[in-house]
Amino acid sequence: MTSQNPIFIPGPTNIPEEMRKAVDMPTIDHRSPVFGRMLHPALEGVKKVLKTTQAQVFLFPSTGTGGWETAITNTLSPGDKVLAARNGMFSHRWIDMCQRHGLDVTFVETPWGEGVPADRFEEILTADKGHEIRVVLATHNETATGVKSDIAAVRRALDAAKHPALLFVDGVSSIGSMDFRMDEWGVDIAVTGSQKGFMLPPGLAIVGFSPKAMEAVETARLPRTFFDIRDMATGYARNGYPYTPPVGLINGLNASCERILAEGLENVFARHHRIASGVRAAVDAWGLKLCAVRPELYSDSVSAIRVPEGFDANLIVSHALETYDMAFGTGLGQVAGKVFRIGHLGSLTDAMALSGIATAEMVMADLGLPIQLGSGVAAAQEHYRQTTAAAQKKAA
């Protein structure tokens, strides 16, 4: 089945034509120099997107979840202590993975709709006089709630506590779409995937290791085989992989990085912010609220929109797909049935966003919600017209 409509789930995202063509390539010998000429530019492109000159990048045939496993198994040992916040579906899942690997996780229960509590982290880290906490986990952009956390504040908490713990960041739904500064924020491991900001099909876990994280690899005793970065680094030095690589996706990653860097990282972030702000203007016009509780927490890659009490938000998602062939995101975990999500990341324009807003209006009106047709569209149009005019004036 092939839809001609844009997709508005928060990943996998719309795939531009040049990325589809790059992925759909003839088979090559992945043990030949040809593959090396494809691999190393992709690694360097990712470093630029991460805003790092120091990190080593690893590409595993997996998803963001495999990236998480890469992070913990390559740096930690059974019983090691980890600090995290439980403020959404994906922080819950990362904590669960740590516990399944035999790690000792201290977690701060945080309401869904709030960000990572850097102040509480600072208190806990300051109290850890023996520096038993080895790693701090933080989700930069919680996809289930549409909440952006302040990673720089988490780094400041570590520094204020004079604590040597490593900082691991889940940037699966932020990197490539929202400002991410691996070196400046002192991120030791950054995790993302191919299917969101990089605008590719699922299948690549993209992980950056700082020099400090690389040092931890040598003392880590958690079992790892497939995700062992030592084997991967050995393969890279020989222009190859320790096993068969996803050649087409790596070729696509080259095309993706070229596109992102040609647009300019700051322009990419500004475009995402402008489109997201238009969606938020529509939500206000509908009289609805976001799951994120304060403007500084609003995500520029996904909006989780609360529906009236007693209404099943899943009906919006199913009706949109069945009636208008448009895909929105369902609510997850604690907010399942309470929110629907509009993804606005990757390959997206103002006009594409307007089609999603208009469809959401039709769906909600069909289902009897008190939504005035055209209200959200008009609010978003006004925002896009004003911001486009301002950008053109600035460019002139």
Curated annotation (Swiss-Prot):
Belongs to the class-V pyridoxal-phosphate-dependent aminotransferase family. Its cofactor is pyridoxal 5'-phosphate. SUPFAM superfamilies: PLP-dependent transferases. Disruption phenotype: Abolishes growth on glycolate or glyoxylate, but the deletion mutant strain is still able to grow on acetate, succinate or glucose with comparable growth rates as for the wild type. Its EC number is 2.6.1.35. This is L-aspartate--glyoxylate aminotransferase. The beta-hydroxyaspartate cycle (BHAC) consists of BhcA, BhcB, BhcC, and BhcD enzyme activities. Overall, it converts two molecules of glyoxylate (C2) into oxaloacetate (C4) without the loss of carbon as CO2, under consumption of just one reducing equivalent and regeneration of the catalytic amino donor, which makes it one of the most efficient glyoxylate assimilation pathways. It holds the Pfam family Aminotran_5. GO terms for biological process: glycine biosynthetic process, by transamination of glyoxylate; glycolate catabolic process; glyoxylate catabolic process. The keyword Transferase applies. Induction: Induced by glycolate. The gene is bhcA. It catalyses: oxaloacetate + glycine = glyoxylate + L-aspartate. Gene3D superfamilies: Aspartate Aminotransferase, domain 1 (3.90.1150.10), Type I PLP-dependent aspartate aminotransferase-like (Major domain) (3.40.640.10). Transmembrane segments: none annotated. Keywords: Aminotransferase, Pyridoxal phosphate, Transferase. Catalyzes the transamination of glyoxylate into glycine using L-aspartate as the preferred amino group donor. Is essential for the growth of P.denitrificans in the presence of glycolate and glyoxylate since it functions in glyoxylate assimilation via the beta-hydroxyaspartate cycle (BHAC). Can catalyze the reverse reaction in vitro, and also use L-serine and L-glutamate as amino group donor, but with much less efficiency than L-aspartate. It comes from the Bacteria. The keyword Transport does not apply. GO terms for molecular function: alanine-glyoxylate transaminase activity; glycine-oxaloacetate transaminase activity; L-serine-pyruvate transaminase activity. The modification N6-(pyridoxal phosphate)lysine is found at residue 196.
